[in-house]
Amino acid sequence: MTIYTIGHSNVETGKIIEVLRSYGIEAVLDVRSSPYSRHAPQFNREDFAEELALAGIDYIYGGNHLGGKPKDPSCYDENDEDRVLYEEVEKKDWYQRGIEGLLQLATEKWTAVMCAEEDPNHCHRHLLIAQTLLDRDIEVQHIRHKGGESWEEPARRTLEREAEQLGFGDEWT
C-alpha cells in the first residue's frame, strides 16, 4: 500500500486537482487542524470539497484526529507552547483512530493526505503522519506540485534508524 501526501500552498484549485488526477487519487483526507485560509481561501473546507466533488474526488476532513495543531494541551512543549510534541501526539488514542481511518480509506481508494504546507519537510504530513505509517511498513509518497515527488520507504527508514543507533548520523544515509 502507498499513501500519498500533498500540500496545497496558494496555487489554484485546478492545479491541485490536475496533479491529484495525474496520480489517480480518488480521495483527499484533509489533515489541517483548521481547514480555512485567509491566504488561500480557495482551499476553505466547503469550497474545496465542492471543487473536488465536481472532479469526482472524495473529500474527507480528518484534522480533528490527524491535524498538526491538536487541541490537547499535553501535546505541546511546556517551555514553548507553539511547539507540538509529535511523539506525544502519536501516543494518543484519537490520533491512532485517525491513522486507522486513513488506512481503511486507503484500502478502498487511492488516497492523498492534504495539508497547507507544500514542502513536506516543514509539515506534520512528513514529521508525524508519514513516520507513523513508515513504522507500520506503509510507503509514503509526497507529491510536490511545484515540481517532483519524494518517496519514504519503510526499508530506508529502518536503515536510517539503525545507522543513527550506531552513531553514523546523516552522512551515512
Predicted regions span which residues?
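Residues lining hydrophobic/aromatic ligand-binding pockets adjacent to catalytic sites
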Residues: 1-173
